[in-house]
Amino acid sequence: MEGTLLRRYGGFYYVESEGRVWTCRLRGRFRLQETVFLPGDRVEIKPVGPGEGVIEDLKPRRTCLKRPAVANVEQVIIVFALREPPPDLELLDRLLFLSGVEDIEAVIVWNKADISKQEYAGLPELYRQIGYRNLITSAHTGQGIDELKALLAGRLSTFAGPSGVGKSSLLNAIQPGLNLRTGEVSSKGGRGRHTTRQAELIRLPDGGWVADTPGFSRLDLPAITREEVAAYFPEMEPLRGRCRYASCLHRKEPGCAVVAAVEAGLIIKHRYEHYLTFLAEVIARERSFS
């Protein structure tokens, strides 16, 4: 019978199938092949005892995120705080970029709205104008929680973002009694303390799954070509084909429509700077393999 892998603990795999959770082990061939199973994987299991089973097969994945490591995700809920820790916009743009490459819908959730700093108040509108879906929340006051519940219902979602922004607090607000560990922001450097150790799927009361995942601070870009980078910046898409040179990479080439848009204030400066950062990383990797 088919089920969904919730989590792994040691050599045991916990799979939900037919309304119950089965404690499973892997078939020997998977151990020999060193197959990596991820939360969200659809698997075929064979019962071998009361509540116990063996994983017989791994179904093809529709999507696969490396970090957070979750399979078959339908949307990524990217959580940042409007106060502490200060929004790392390069990390935000990197997460949006990766979601685009993986063809997974991204939603930006701006948490801690009840204690937001004025200097960050304009960020949701900036990203809305680019074309990203935004939601403003407060796990403390309940602002935006009903909208977030509706967004998650019936879908497999993952929460991503740095530690300390309130991912676990939001999940606790969505499903009271979940009692996920929550972290405070460290006074040293304003970084959040990690409170989630490994990814696991959580069944939501209105249907659907959410992956509670570890915090992180660095993500490598996927294996794409330098020509593809701009395609994952939505604000650059309308300018495709308008540069003087077809091979333009938008790095100060003569007649570059993207550079002109940046200078005219039509493209946000930090977004363009992050495009150049990602482009440089992709080019460096291409050269390392040439």
UniProtKB/Swiss-Prot annotation:
Zn(2+) binds at residues 243, 248, 250, 256. The lineage of its organism: Bacteria, Bacillati, Bacillota, Clostridia, Moorellales. Its EC number is 3.6.1.-. Its main location: cytoplasm. It comes from Moorella thermoacetica (strain ATCC 39073 / JCM 9320). This is Small ribosomal subunit biogenesis GTPase RsgA. Monomer. Associates with 30S ribosomal subunit, binds 16S rRNA. It is found in: Cytoplasm. NCBIfam families: ribosome small subunit-dependent GTPase A.
